[in-house]
Amino acid sequence: MKIFIVIPCYNEEAVLPKTLEVLGNLIKTIKVKTDADTELLLVDDGSRDRTWQMISDAAKEHKYVHGIKLSHNRGHQNALWAGMEAVVDHCDAMVSIDADLQDDENVIIDMVQQVQEGKDIIYGVRKERKTDTFFKRFTAQAFYKLMQSVDKDTVYNHADFRMMTNRTLKALMQYSERNLFLRAIVRQLGFREGFVYYDRKAREAGESKYPLTKMLSFSIDGITSFSVAPLKFITFLGLAMTLVAIIMIIFALVEHVQGKTIQGWTSLLVSMWFIGGIITTGVGITGVYIGKIYTEVKRRPRYFIEERV
């Protein structure tokens, strides 16, 4: 059985030596416990530091290390896709994991064993996030709960740490969309699923590649790529506001018939600003969906590979 571990990398100079050491030892353990041959594919997503040089040096030193360098920073999802596309014809199964190894690499052994037992996709699920800051933990939980509210198939506390067999990889490669949100796409494949649970570790070196701005952008991409719930919400809100307006018109007419004058410039201005805000928000949300359609119809390449080792 041949396995590839695909690792997207972006400015991982500080953590990469430790990552390569840990995964090198893991490869030996996997061989002993499962008799599977394992290799690494590191995808440099246009790093500005010495990440690619370190990958190249590791590939020269170890036969099990391979690397591809993207010509430009294309984002985590595209880098991961590039790695999967590169190994799909050369492996029986593939596991994706981030370079910081905050996800427990040791459960990959359990993933391999589940694949050998007949499972096709094994999801890595975080049990605890004690090493995260309160803000990171709170925002992550809010994101997963929001995703589950718009897509019931979302795996709670699962990121992109998963193992997929060759046939599921080939099925995934048939998806042609450019707005990638892999954790939702993979769930749509079906097949026989398994789960492994682990505690998230602290990052040993370097900085998180997902600051607040990127987290928000990723959340919006995830929701709008796989749900029209925001558009439905706007429609519902518009109908609700129309109903309120009708009630207010009836109330005003009744007051007028009774000879009463309705005062309230303040309430009128507040109502106008409120309605204006709702309309602007609705136009913005609609614009996000139109922008995604615009991106899809252009059919531009996801990435270009500058170099391989």
Descriptions of predicted regions:
Residues 1-132:
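Structured catalytic core of nucleotide-sugar glycosyltransferases
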Residues 8, 30, 43, 114, ...:
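Histidine kinase transmitter module recognition
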Residues 25, 29, 57, 61, ...:
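Conserved amphipathic alpha-helical interaction elements at protein-protein interfaces in regulatory
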Residues 68-72, 76-86, 105-180, 201-216, ...:
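Acceptor/aglycone-binding surface of glycosyltransferases and processive sugar-polymer synthases
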Residues 183-309:
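Hydrophobic helical membrane-anchoring modules
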